[in-house]
Amino acid sequence: MKSTSLFLCSLLLLLVTGAIGRKTKEKYSQSEEVVSESFASGPSSGSSDDELVRDKPYGPKVSGGSFGEEASEEISSRRSKHISRSSGGSNMEGESSYAKKKRSRFAQDVLN
């Protein structure tokens, strides 16, 4: 009796593991197809060269955006704060905020 129940439990475990493996393989192959199609088709015609569009078929949907967008905005703001601290107030192009203000004031004076 014990060996029969052990055999049935082993068989059940094997079937469940196989089913989970198949589902995972199907999901992986579908996501692989989506990635290969997006690389084959190239950037969408509606986007500019500077803009990257990423389709998000999966993931949480929240009104007013998704968690991923909020997290990326937070990361970019942290990154810009870190860059401004580490570069002594200058931006990526090497121009300080003081020089930018001075240039914009000069442009306003010229326009007036």
Curated annotation (Swiss-Prot):
Tagged with keyword Signal: yes
GO function terms (MF aspect): identical protein binding
Tissue-by-tissue expression: Testis.
Bias-annotated ranges (Low complexity): 36-47, 85-97
Major place of residence: secreted
Induction entry: By testosterone.
Subcellular location: Secreted, Extracellular space
Leader peptide range in chain numbering: 1-21
GO cellular component: extracellular space; protein-containing complex
Pfam families in alphabetical order: Svs_4_5_6 (PF17381)
Annotated spans, Disordered: 26-112
Keywords noted in UniProt: Secreted, Signal
Stored InterPro entries: Svs4/5/6
Domain of life assignment: Eukaryota
UniProt family annotation: Belongs to the SVP2/SVP5/SVP6 family.
PANTHER family per the UniProt record, alphabetical: SEMINAL VESICLE SECRETORY PROTEIN 4, SEMINAL VESICLE SECRETORY PROTEIN 6-RELATED
Name of this chain's protein: Seminal vesicle secretory protein 4
Originating species: Rattus norvegicus
Underlying gene: Svs4
